[in-house]
Design a protein with these regions (language model features):
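Asp-based, Mg2+/Mn2+-dependent phosphohydrolase catalytic module
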Residues: 2-13, 105-108, 112, 121-238
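Active-site neighborhood of HAD-like aspartate-dependent phosphohydrolases
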Residues: 2-51
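Conserved phosphate-coupling serine/threonine residues in phosphotransfer and NTP-handling enzymes
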Residues: 22, 118-120
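Short, surface-exposed alpha-helical segments at coil->helix boundaries
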Residues: 28-32, 59, 122, 126
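Short beta->alpha linker loops
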Residues: 29, 53, 57, 81, ...
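Alpha-helical substrate-recognition element adjacent to the catalytic core
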Residues: 32-76, 98
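Metal-dependent phosphoesterase signature
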Residues: 65-102, 110
Length: 238
């Protein structure tokens, strides 16, 4: 459909980036750290349990692992082990996802605020920011800084508030079902770039194989398109 005149001037007020699996190819590093923890606990992590962890907070991932292994271990000890092992890997092996660096720099160069919205805890995020460039972000929200982590909308609502943006004019870029649910519940427009788990298109999101070639005008077009969809009587795209 053609954009209504009221919506033609809509712009992206902020871009809210997930980190693991979206900006950084770090899910593979989490695989290694989680496998090491499972081994230390005397078991093997199932593929199903690992899929459930994608996009989860540290505490939720530990709970999933303990349940999967059928053990009653100390969550604090497991969390400390996992954090230490992940930190070792983050310091030496982080790499960018295709197109992520280019889009992040383009957003920054255009003067559009970027926020990092991650389920990873603050200490590990600070290590990752050495690779990402902390100067490129106007704000960051970590999994240990919210009461309700993803899939609750709190992380994305918090990020939008920190940069002074209306969530409906923010594009959230995510790779996981939990993160997408969080962003959509907050009212954001979502660009999904699946990493470990397949994501289907929906009226509230676009899906791309990677961020390669994605531009700020592309994100602005998504905001306008979703605004148009909300103005339809049935709330659906036409």
């Amino acid at each position: 459909m053609t954009s209504t005149p009221a919506n033609t001037g809509l712009k992206v007020q902020a871009v809210l980036f997930d980190m693991d699996g979206t900006l950084l190819d770090s899910e593979k590093l989490w695989d290694l750290a989680l496998e090491d923890l499972a081994t230390a606990l005397g078991g093997d992590l199932s593929a199903r349990a690992r899929r459930r962890m994608v996009g989860s907070s540290l505490a939720r991932s530990i709970a999933i692992m303990h349940d999967d292994l059928g053990i009653d271990a100390d969550p604090e000890s497991s969390g400390a082990y996992l954090t230490e092992r992940a930190a070792e890997l983050f310091r030496t092996s982080l790499v960018w996802k295709p197109g992520a660096r280019e889009l992040l720099h383009a957003v920054h160069a255009a003067g559009v605020p970027a926020a990092l919205v991650t389920s990873t805890n603050r200490p590990l995020t600070e290590i990752a920011l050495d690779t990402l460039g902390r100067e490129l972000f106007a704000a960051s929200v970590c999994g240990d800084e919210v009461v309700h982590p993803k899939p609750h909308p709190e992380p994305y609502l918090t990020a939008a508030a920190l940069v002074g943006a209306n969530p409906e004019q923010c594009v959230a870029i995510e790779d996981s079902p939990l993160g997408i649910a969080s962003a959509e519940a907050a009212g954001c427009v979502v660009l999904a770039v699946p990493s470990e788990v397949a994501i289907e298109p929906a009226p509230t999101r676009s899906v791309r194989d990677s961020l390669t070639g994605v531009t700020l005008p592309d994100l602005a077009a998504m905001v306008r398109s979703w605004s148009d969809a909300r103005t339809e009587p049935d709330g659906q795209r036409t």
